[in-house]
Regions:
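The feature captures the beta-strand-to-loop junction immediately N-terminal to the Walker
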Residues: 34-36
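Conserved ABC ATPase "signature" region
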Residues: 96-113, 165
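A short, proline-enriched helix->beta-strand linker immediately N-terminal to the Walker B motif
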Residues: 136-140
Length: 336
């Protein structure tokens, strides 16, 4: 264990931005701190790095901590000189700085930029150099705040691929703040999910996706479909929903949003609403389709006061038998 915090609360002004967070970082792992804007991710990172004093709780650090802030600010020097400057601040002997800087630039795919003035770099190139500086100093714990922010999709994808191998180290723990789930999935061995300043989930990405611990975590992870029968709540992601001519559930397309290679469909069912991605030619709004549901997250119904619904299994059976959706059922779809 290289870093641990226990019951950490961090305050900005009179407001608690991070509340009662306990977590640890272990050598050899990349951990993504994931949450929406305003969740308190950067504040927690600053406190863990020692830049902010917590209002409560304790932090235990083993080894040196390096942090790369969100803005990739570079000095008016060459790229190589910028990385060497970071090494000088870190106390690396002068004789080692050149080789260490070139090694870090090579690891992040930026060796060809070494002689370029920093002022001539594109946004993606500046991000690469920013990461190279952080890697070059070889901290025991490396913290990165939104290292891929502000990049277009292609540049971000390329940088993610290079960063994954560059950040991997058996001797170092890496904590990366992100708000994009795709970035977390690409990088992390483990996720820490922060919502409203509270740590609400921790675990390997695939495990959290297969079995989110709560409704709020599921919704944050993209479970935007909802079917509820008064006894059980089923939340789904588009990947769980398949159009199937002989599927057990009847649905009506209420919205179709064009995508590059298909359409995102909003589908009204008897007891809720789900979303699916369909290839072209996709069904149009108003069309009736049949679907099957493969997976999803199940929770006890939190809406005990709803009108009595059939169980999901009975609903599936009745639709299979061809019972039409009446006016009352259509109204329920509209309310869902």
């Amino acid at each position: 264990m290289l870093l641990r915090c226990e019951h950490l609360t961090v305050r900005r002004g009179k407001r608690d931005v991070v509340t009662d967070v306990s977590a640890e970082l272990r050598a050899g792992e990349i951990v993504a701190l994931l949450g929406p804007n305003g969740a308190g991710k950067s504040t927690l990172l600053d406190a863990l790095a020692g830049a902010l004093t917590p209002a409560a709780g304790r932090i235990e650090r083993h080894g040196r901590v390096g942090i790369a802030l969100q803005a990739p600010d570079l000095a008016r020097r060459t790229v190589l000189a910028n990385v060497m400057l970071a090494l000088a601040w870190w106390g690396v002997p002068r004789a080692e700085r050149g080789d260490r800087a070139r090694e870090a630039l090579r690891a992040i795919g930026a060796e060809h930029l070494a002689s370029r003035p920093a002022a001539t770099l594109s946004g993606g190139e500046r991000r690469r150099v920013h990461l190279a500086r952080a890697i070059a100093v070889r901290p025991d714990v490396l913290m990165l705040d939104e290292p891929f922010a502000g990049l277009d999709a292609e540049v971000r994808s390329n940088l993610l691929e290079d960063a994954l191998s560059a950040l991997r180290s058996s001797a170092r723990a890496t904590l990366v703040v992100v708000h994009d789930r795709a970035e977390a999935w690409a990088l992390a061995d483990r996720l820490l999910i922060l919502l409203d300043g509270r740590l609400v989930a921790s675990g390997p990405p695939r495990e959290l996706l297969e079995q989110p611990p709560s409704v709020e975590v599921a919704r944050f992870l993209g479970f935007d479909g909802r079917i509820e029968d008064g006894r059980e709540l089923l939340l789904t992601r588009p990947a769980h929903i398949a159009l199937d001519p002989v599927g057990p559930l009847a649905a009506r397309v209420t919205r179709a949003t064009p995508l590059e290679d298909g359409a995102r469909l909003e589908l009204a069912l008897e007891h809720g609403r789900v979303y699916a991605v369909a290839p072209l030619p996709a069904p149009r709004p108003g069309e009736d389709v049949r679907i099957r549901i493969d997976g999803g997250a199940r929770f006890p119904s939190g809406d005990r006061g709803n009108r009595g619904y059939q169980s999901l299994d009975r609903a599936s059976a009745s639709v299979q038998e061809g019972e039409p959706a009446g006016a009352d059922q259509q109204a329920e779809r509209d309310e869902a």
